[in-house]
């Protein structure tokens, strides 16, 4: 099921269509105008059931505020009147912002200005009917989002993790080459790192969505285990990216001089990291790591080569994390 519909139409689009159909059906059965309920239903479909409920709690009172101002200013200025539309929109935005209901402001304003032409003299009826239709849209969309095609981001998360890891390994290898060639300030590496961090941030967002969704679906022990493994992998990737950024973002106008032994050690480690992409295996170089450790130990606390010590230390931390990931099993 997950495979065929995603190639044609997304699950969230399907749920939006279903919520729109059911909402309009219920409203028509109750002889209510469905447009306001549909607006609420469409914006209530969120990436997770938790997000739908959380934002729904704020969208409903925001819609009530919009309907209230529409009725109030229609009563004061009448319809048609430019002042009715202006003050309805303006005060709806102001009050929603003041009450921290920004997530519902758009729907509240649309509801407010759209209902003005149909109010006439039926002030109370229109107010309560808009309240009822908004509630129908909110509840219907929330149930659809909870029951129909619960979001599963596992495959997307794992694909993102694999993509970010390969990009990270390539960037580490190329950055080591730049350092050995004396290119300490690199716009190319900066750009690649920014793109990498974008993928990592997206992965962490999707992981958060999946965690929120699982809280509403009990008895999913296998999925919790899978999510835990994904979260641990994502956490290590974040650490690796942090250490990698520390050898990319260096002070301007620095100059590092590596000994021949240090250069050979860095080359061996960077090649081993780059080979993970092909072999999915990290070949440790204990002697190279020992060489770099000795270089760090020889430097004094306030040595003029402290930046060099910092760079080598970050390389060793990346080496240690990868060694633990691929060899401590």
From Swiss-Prot:
It holds the Pfam family ArAE_1. The chain crosses the membrane at residues 25-45, 60-80, 87-107, 108-128, 131-151. Keywords: Cell membrane, Membrane, Transmembrane, Transmembrane helix. It comes from the Bacteria. One of its GO terms (cellular component) is plasma membrane. InterPro entries: ArAE_1. It is found in: Cell membrane. It is a multi-pass membrane protein. Belongs to the UPF0421 family. This is UPF0421 protein SH1063. It comes from Staphylococcus haemolyticus (strain JCSC1435).
């Amino acid at each position: 099921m997950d495979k065929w519909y995603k190639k044609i139409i997304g699950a969230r689009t399907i749920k939006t269509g279903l919520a729109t159909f059911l909402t309009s059906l219920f409203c028509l059965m109750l002889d209510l105008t469905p447009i306001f309920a549909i607006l609420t239903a469409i914006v209530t479909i969120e990436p997770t059931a938790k997000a739908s409920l959380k934002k729904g709690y704020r969208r409903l009172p925001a819609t009530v505020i919009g309907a209230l101002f529409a009725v109030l200013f229609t009563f004061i200025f009448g319809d048609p009147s430019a002042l009715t539309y202006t003050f309805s929109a303006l005060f709806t935005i102001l009050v929603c912002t003041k009450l921290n209901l920004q997530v519902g402001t758009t729907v509240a304003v649309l509801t407010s200005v759209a209902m003005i032409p149909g109010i006439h003299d039926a002030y109370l009826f229109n107010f309560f009917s808009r309240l009822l239709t908004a509630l129908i849209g909110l509840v219907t969309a929330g149930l659809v989002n909870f029951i129909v095609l619960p979001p599963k981001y596992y495959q997307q998360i794992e694909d993102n993790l694999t993509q970010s890891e390969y990009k990270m390994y390539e960037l580490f290898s190329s950055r080591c080459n730049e350092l050995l060639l004396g290119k300490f300030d690199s716009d190319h590496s900066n750009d690649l790192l920014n793109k990498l961090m974008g993928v990592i941030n997206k992965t962490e967002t999707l992981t958060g969505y999946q965690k929120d969704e699982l809280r509403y679906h009990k008895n999913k022990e296998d999925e919790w285990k899978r999510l835990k493994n994904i979260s641990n992998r994502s956490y290590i990737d974040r650490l690796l990216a942090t250490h990698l950024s520390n050898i990319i973002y260096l002070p301007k106008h620095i100059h590092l001089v590596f000994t021949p032994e240090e250069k050979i050690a860095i080359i061996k480690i960077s090649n081993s990291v780059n080979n993970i992409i092909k072999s999915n295996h990290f070949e440790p170089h204990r002697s190279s790591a020992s060489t770099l450790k000795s270089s760090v130990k020889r430097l004094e606390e306030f040595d003029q080569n402290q930046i060099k010590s910092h760079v080598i230390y970050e390389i060793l931390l990346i080496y240690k994390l990868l060694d633990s990931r691929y060899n401590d099993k």
